[in-house]
């Protein structure tokens, strides 16, 4: 198996580089990435650089966080997955011990490790990536990995619609053309 990944060199220029296939830690799965959605934040990162630039100017910057693929290896403590399982990921991995995480609001954890952003800028535009078992989800049999890559943006869109209390017959305006907004239109 070989691995490569796309990294941002400077705004507007990406490069495909060879990379080692990562080895999963004891609580991680190794995923062969099959599909990656392109989010508005990826477009911004490509055009202007990351929202929060890395402290190290030599830091590799990967893009992409909406992805799905197939498990090819698992860490020694992984119990929910086996090679061959089709999965998608929650791209934000919280600290697990702050006030918000303990209240079940891990999506607003101030120390979340969100793919393609600080602290490590690892992106999903790669052939293989490792991800924690607890933030990896098995796809149902009737969903392919292309659809699986859209679960995260669909969840964000659904959450936004629920917060806005959108109901049939209610007049709303949706501005924008990204993946999430396109899914809200549906």
Question: What kind of feature is each model-predicted range?
Answer:
Residues 2-4:
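Extreme N-terminal starter segment of soluble prokaryotic enzymes
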Residues 181:
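Catalytic nucleophile loop
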Residues 65, 95-175:
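NAD(P)H dinucleotide-binding glycine-rich loop of Rossmann-like/cofactor-binding domains
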Residues 22-36, 51-99, 140-142:
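Glycine-rich beta-strand-centered segment in the early N-terminal region that forms part
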Residues 41-46:
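Cytochrome P450 core scaffold surrounding the K-helix E-X-X-R motif
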Residues 184-186:
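Conserved small/polar residues in nucleotide/adenosyl-binding loops
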Residues 10-12, 25:
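Residue-level recognition of beta-strand termini and adjacent short loop/turns
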């Amino acid at each position: 198996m070989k691995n490569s990944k796309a990294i941002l060199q400077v705004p507007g220029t990406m490069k495909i580089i060879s990379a080692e296939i990562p080895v999963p830690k004891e609580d991680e799965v190794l995923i062969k990435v099959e599909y990656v959605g392109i989010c508005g934040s990826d477009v911004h990162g490509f055009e202007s650089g990351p929202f929060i630039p890395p402290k190290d100017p030599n830091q590799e910057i990967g893009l992409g966080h909406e992805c799905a693929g197939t498990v090819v290896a698992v860490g020694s403590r992984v119990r929910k997955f086996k090679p061959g399982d089709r999965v998608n990921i929650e791209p934000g991995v919280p600290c697990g011990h702050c006030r918000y995480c303990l209240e079940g609001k891990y999506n607003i954890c101030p120390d979340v490790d969100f793919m393609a952003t600080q602290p490590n800028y690892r992106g999903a535009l790669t052939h293989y990536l490792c991800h924690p078992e607890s933030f990896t989800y098995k796809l149902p049999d009737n969903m392919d990995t292309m659809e699986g890559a859209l679960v995260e943006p669909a969840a964000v869109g659904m959450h936004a619609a629920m917060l806005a209390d959108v109901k049939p017959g209610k007049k709303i305006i949706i501005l924008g053309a990204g993946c999430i907004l396109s899914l809200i239109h549906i």
